[in-house]
């Protein structure tokens, strides 16, 4: 493996948005550690990556298991001795509870402690703990990108979306704190969202016409910008893939798709004594 090749970890990489982003990075020459629970789908990524500039290393892991984070990092470091990019994408959606959630909302009083714990573990705790495991190596190298897939702000406060919306809101809040903690380290923390209902396995059967949904590949252009040298100084931002204009040069497209990470646009710091 060439010494100047960059390494990325992508969680939830075997299907949907995660697969599109992982293969986009492979196409850009990254060596990608593709993390997912589904070993069979992970294995199919090897053939898809064949002949591309980068490589795929499938890594089966359950991110609800606290032991998985250090194992993933060890795998990535064992391949190249470096980790340049962490893409926190793994998540569970409302359809895992009720496939018809689109017209039969999951009310908050239906949410059991077990369901709440499961959604928090995967959608909020996992990205935080993955960053905790990866970032010290990035800081030591003086460079690194943490990119986390959350969801549209409207989804975070939507009727019937306590499980998914609130857990993704927790993840975004955490990434804003990471961004503040990382100032001056050479490592950045940003959020990337599709900007609408996307045609992935997370979506239930009654969420509308799949032909009219956003496609997972919409995430690739903003992701490739965020991992490029042109995005070196960008921190504490959220990028909305649906607003990315592929007819523009990447820096101009980024300006159109970029807003502050939640909730910096409305945040007011509390009054401190003294």
Labelled PLM ranges:
Residues 107-115, 145-170, 175-176, 180-184, ...:
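Catalytic loop of short-chain dehydrogenase/reductase
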Residues 131-132, 176:
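A short, exposed helix-loop element centered on a Lys and neighboring polar residues
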Residues 70, 93-117, 140, 160-163:
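Conserved mid-core segment of classical short-chain dehydrogenase/reductases
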Residues 39-40, 60-72, 113:
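The beta1-alpha1 cofactor-binding region of Rossmann-like NAD(H)/NADP(H)-dependent oxidoreductases
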Residues 2-33:
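Canonical Rossmann dinucleotide-binding motif of NAD(H)/NADP(H)-dependent dehydrogenases/reductases
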Residues 184, 191-192, 208-274:
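C-terminal helical subdomain
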Residues 28-44:
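Conserved glycine-rich Rossmann-like NAD(P)H-binding loop of the short-chain dehydrogenase/reductase
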């Amino acid at each position: 493996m060439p010494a100047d090749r960059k390494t990325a970890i992508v969680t939830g990489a075997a299907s949907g948005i995660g697969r599109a982003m992982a293969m986009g990075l492979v196409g850009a020459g990254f060596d990608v550690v593709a993390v997912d629970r589904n070993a069979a789908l992970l294995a199919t990524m090897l053939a898809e990556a064949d002949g591309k500039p980068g490589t795929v290393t499938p890594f089966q892991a359950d991110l609800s298991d606290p032991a998985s984070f250090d194992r993933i990092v060890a795998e990535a470091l064992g391949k190249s001795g470096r980790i340049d990019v962490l893409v926190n994408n793994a998540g569970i959606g409302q359809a895992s509870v009720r496939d018809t959630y689109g017209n039969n909302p999951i009310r908050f009083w239906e949410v059991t402690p077990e369901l709440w714990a499961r959604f928090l573990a995967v959608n909020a705790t996992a990205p935080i703990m993955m960053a905790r495991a990866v970032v010290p190596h990035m800081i030591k190298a003086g460079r690194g990108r943490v990119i986390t897939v959350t969801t549209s702000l409207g989804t975070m406060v939507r009727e019937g979306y306590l499980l998914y919306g609130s857990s993704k809101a927790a993840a975004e809040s955490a990434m804003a704190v990471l961004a503040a903690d990382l100032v001056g380290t050479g490592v950045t923390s940003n959020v990337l969202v599709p900007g609408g209902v996307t045609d992935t396995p997370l979506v239930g059967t009654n969420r509308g016409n799949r032909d009219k949904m956003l496609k997972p590949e919409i995430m690739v252009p903003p992701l490739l910008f965020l991992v490029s040298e042109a995005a070196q100084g960008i921190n504490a931002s959220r990028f909305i893939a649906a607003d990315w204009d592929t007819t523009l040069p990447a820096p101009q497209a980024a300006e159109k798709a970029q807003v502050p990470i939640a909730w910096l646009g409305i945040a007011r710091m509390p009054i401190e004594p003294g």
